[in-house]
């Protein structure tokens, strides 16, 4: 069966750029990859066809030969040169398939694990710091103890016993990866001998057993700025795990969690609290002390105050950590009904109730409520 034109296979024009070729090939590889189409012979053939087309068109010399002579210019069976051996002059599919595999499995090829040999950055650490509301609002300094990995002192992080040193891996030549030939294309894999490090330790350190790092807990002083809230993070640069083979140390992220307060609730820069008052103070008005984070302040209660009435104390909230003026303290009134009354108190309340009978002028909502009840039952 005659071969299709390589440009047609990839769905591109003859003058397409290298970037366009790569984009087209990647799209086809994603669509027809065997991992996505198991037992689908048609997709398998399309996948192979796309591989063959891209290997030729991504190589400048092969592309020039193909453009001039067609398939005969690149197919040795037809008298052409080159072929599809995937040798030194062949196309390198590893970069493309790094992206393809990333899309398959949700991650790239980078990171602290494998990758190319040599120094590797240490992992970042996370520490949850519990604070009370006062500490979060005012700021504080806290000492924390964090388990981590540090460089082994006897071998100075090399992993090799004192007097010896790691040697270059003969399998990968210190790169940390090896090229594997798979059909028409080649991919790079982590070296199975050095596990991606590029070095081999023949005489490992007795303290770290060749790892170059050991577990240790260290105490750190964390300065918490005023105004932090739950979810805020403080970054301590260079306080994460030590890097492998002399790589840079990771960072430590201290994540703030503010505990619930017995009196105040926080919403951003504003605070809220409930203030209980007697029904006599609510009816007659008065003055009472309410708590704030700065101490007690006096709050004037007008006569006839109802449950749910909210009073705003400006500037008595929280000054945000990222700047700006302090929020407010919102005090919600809750009128308390007296209990455990004495005989005299009951008598006085009975007299008071009698004096209010048939007089709705003293109730701010009664008339409207009773009218609503009448309409409700009238509609039934």
UniProtKB/Swiss-Prot annotation:
One of its GO terms (biological process) is DNA replication. CXXCXGXG motif repeats lie at residues 152-159, 169-176, 191-198, 205-212. SMART domains: DnaJ. Zn(2+) 1 binds at residues 152, 155, 205, 208. Binds 2 Zn(2+) ions per monomer. Zn(2+) 2 binds at residues 169, 172, 191, 194. It is found in: Cytoplasm. GO terms for molecular function: ATP binding; heat shock protein binding; unfolded protein binding; zinc ion binding. Keywords: Chaperone, Cytoplasm, DNA replication, Metal-binding, Repeat, Stress response, Zinc, Zinc-finger. One of its GO terms (cellular component) is cytoplasm. Disulfide bonds: none annotated. A zinc finger (CR-type) spans 139-217. Its cofactor is Zn(2+). Signal peptide: none annotated. Residues 5-70 form the J domain. The keyword Transit peptide does not apply. The J domain is necessary and sufficient to stimulate DnaK ATPase activity. Zinc center 1 plays an important role in the autonomous, DnaK-independent chaperone activity of DnaJ. Zinc center 2 is essential for interaction with DnaK and for DnaJ activity. PANTHER family: CHAPERONE PROTEIN DNAJ (PTHR43096:SF48), DNAJ HOMOLOG 1, MITOCHONDRIAL-RELATED (PTHR43096). Participates actively in the response to hyperosmotic and heat shock by preventing the aggregation of stress-denatured proteins and by disaggregating proteins, also in an autonomous, DnaK-independent fashion. Unfolded proteins bind initially to DnaJ; upon interaction with the DnaJ-bound protein, DnaK hydrolyzes its bound ATP, resulting in the formation of a stable complex. GrpE releases ADP from DnaK; ATP binding to DnaK triggers the release of the substrate protein, thus completing the reaction cycle. Homodimer. Belongs to the DnaJ family. HAMAP family: DnaJ (MF_01152). This is Chaperone protein DnaJ. The gene is dnaJ.
């Amino acid at each position: 069966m005659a071969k299709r034109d390589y440009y047609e296979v990839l769905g591109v024009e003859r003058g397409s750029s290298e970037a366009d070729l790569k984009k087209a090939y990647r799209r086809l590889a994603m669509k027809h990859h065997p991992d996505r189409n198991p037992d689908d012979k048609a997709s398998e053939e399309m996948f192979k066809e796309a591989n063959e087309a891209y290997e030729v068109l991504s190589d400048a010399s092969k592309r020039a030969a193909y453009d001039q002579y067609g398939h005969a210019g690149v197919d040795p069976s037809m008298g052409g040169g080159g072929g599809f051996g995937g040798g030194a002059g062949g196309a390198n599919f590893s970069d493309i398939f790094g992206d393809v595999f990333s899309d398959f499995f949700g991650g790239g090829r980078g990171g602290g694990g494998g990758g190319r040999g040599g120094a590797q950055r240490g992992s970042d650490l996370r520490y949850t710091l519990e604070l009370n509301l006062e500490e979060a609002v005012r700021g504080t300094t806290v000492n924390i103890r964090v388990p981590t990995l540090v460089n082994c002192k006897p071998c100075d992080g090399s992993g090799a016993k004192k007097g010896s040193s790691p040697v270059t891996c003969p399998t990968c030549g210190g790169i940390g990866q090896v090229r594997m030939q798979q059909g028409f294309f080649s991919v790079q894999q982590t070296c199975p001998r050095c596990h991606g490090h590029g070095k081999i330790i023949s005489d490992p350190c007795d303290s770290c057993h060749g790892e170059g790092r050991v577990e240790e807990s260290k105490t750190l002083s964390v300065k918490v700025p005023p105004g932090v809230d739950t979810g805020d993070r403080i970054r301590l640069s260079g306080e994460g795990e030590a890097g492998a083979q002399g790589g840079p140390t990771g960072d430590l992220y201290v994540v703030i969690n503010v505990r619930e307060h017995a009196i105040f609730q926080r919403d951003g820069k504003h605070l809220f609290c409930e203030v209980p008052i007697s029904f006599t103070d609510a009816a007659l008005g008065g003055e009472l002390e309410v708590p704030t984070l700065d101490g007690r302040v006096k709050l004037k209660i007008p006569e006839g105050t109802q449950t749910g009435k909210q009073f705003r104390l400006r500037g008595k909230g929280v000054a945000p950590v990222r700047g700006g003026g302090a929020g407010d303290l919102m005090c919600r009134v809750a009128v308390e009904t007296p209990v455990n009354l004495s005989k005299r108190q009951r008598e006085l309340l009975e007299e008071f109730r009698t004096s209010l009978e048939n007089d709705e002028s003293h109730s701010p909502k009664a008339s409207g409520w009773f009218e609503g009840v009448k309409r409700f039952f009238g509609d039934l």
